[in-house]
A protein has these predicted regions:
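Conserved glycine(s) in the ABC-transporter nucleotide-binding domain "signature"
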Residues: 1-120
Length: 120
């Protein structure tokens, strides 16, 4: 038997994950953002956002998202933030499941009478 508080926490984590998924698109794994700069002949520096996908070890696909702060850039920032939040919540969920399993397996150690026997 495990704590009802743990079961409630598990449900809370699952609800949070579901809410994040419903709030918008979630970036796939191995996608991240980088920035690059370009300097014009007049000396003005422009900053651009790039979306990078790691294909395999050492291989990357790069796609320009326009200037930093552009609509595409902000959309990917939010998408990656949602992914990172889901990954964190899933890790917490895994730890919680392990704790619940441990409680279930070791309940015989805790669910017994520890009181002193009555003296006559």
């Amino acid at each position: 038997m495990f704590s009802s508080h743990l079961e409630a926490e598990k449900q809370c984590l699952l609800n949070c994950i579901e809410a994040i998924r419903k709030s918008g698109s979630v970036a796939p794994a191995r996608y991240f953002l980088t920035t690059t700069t370009t300097t014009s002949e007049a000396g003005k520096t422009y900053y651009y956002a790039r979306l990078v996908k790691e294909e395999s070890v050492g291989k990357q696909t790069v796609r320009s998202l326009g200037r930093i702060g552009s609509g595409q850039h902000r959309a990917w920032e939010r998408s990656i933030a949602r992914r990172d939040a889901i990954v964190e919540l899933e890790q917490q969920l895994k730890l919680l499941d392990e704790l619940m399993q441990r409680q279930q397996e070791r309940s015989h150690l805790v669910d017994r009478d520890f009181s002193e026997p009555e003296k006559d």
